[in-house]
Regions:
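Hot-dog-fold acyl-thioester-processing enzymes
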Residues: 2-113, 175-187
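Short peripheral tails and domain-boundary helices/loops at the edges of structured domains
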Residues: 3-7, 151-174
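Intrinsic-disorder/low-complexity, polar/charged segments enriched in Ser/Thr/Lys/Arg/Asp/Glu/Gln
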Residues: 36, 42-49, 129-131, 148-150, ...
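A short acidic/small-residue loop/turn micro-motif
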Residues: 55, 138-139, 170-172
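Hydrophobic small-molecule pocket/channel-lining residues, especially in calycin-type beta-barrels
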Residues: 62, 71, 79-82, 110, ...
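Hydrophobic beta-sheet segments that form the core/acyl-binding groove
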Residues: 114-158
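A structural preference for long, well-packed, hydrophobic secondary-structure segments
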Residues: 117-122, 168-173, 180-184
Length: 187
């Protein structure tokens, strides 16, 4: 729990209990997985990730994996001699992936619905250290069995310079769907 108790820890609120393994194994809480529902989402709740430095090797591995060989991310000579920043960038797709991955909660009742307002605000360079702050912005009933939750992600580098912003829509299962039967969109 953090110092001022304003934001409660979320990992390990409740675990899942698979029936296809020995019961004594099933009763052990699952590492890095959560079991919260729509009703459990607290608006304005924030979490912050650990920091992570992006190395040259992993940047090139990511570029190769996604076939992004733009000179700004893959050509040291171009970046130094002709590029606007005079050094190589980390691919925006990598900053997005790493930034969101740093605060991924692996909730078994939540499913990605899509992303809005993705912006690459400032460049990230090889050797930069990033961290992410995630905030629950809003929620609304949407379907018979699940609602939508909008979450913001702000990725920072160094001592707090914002480099990326996006909003993630999650569809999240209701704990008690009957409580929302008159609130969801009917088709």
């Amino acid at each position: 729990m953090n110092k001022d108790f304003k934001y409660k820890n979320t990992v390990g609120i409740e675990s899942t209990y698979p029936k296809d393994m020995p019961e004594d194994h099933s009763n052990i809480p699952v590492w890095n997985s959560e079991n919260w529902f729509y009703e459990d989402v607290i608006i304005d709740h924030k979490i912050r990730s650990l920091r992570r430095t992006i190395s040259e090797g992993e940047a090139m591995q990511f570029n190769g994996m996604v076939l992004d060989m733009h000179p700004y991310v893959g050509d040291e000579h171009f970046a130094k001699n002709e590029g606007l920043f005079k050094k190589r960038l980390v691919a925006g797709a990598m900053v997005f992936s790493y930034g969101l991955g740093l605060v991924a909660t692996n909730c078994v009742n939540s499913f990605s619905y899509g992303y809005d307002r993705l912006r690459f605000i400032k460049p990230v360079f090889i050797g930069d250290t990033i961290y992410t702050i995630r905030k629950n912005m809003e929620k609304k009933p949407k379907y018979e069995k699940m609602g939508l939750v909008r979450t913001s992600y702000e990725v920072f580098k160094g001592k707090g310079e914002i480099v990326l912003y996006c909003e993630h829509l999650h569809s999240v299962l209701y704990k008690k769907p009957q409580d929302f039967k008159d609130q969801f969109e009917k088709k």
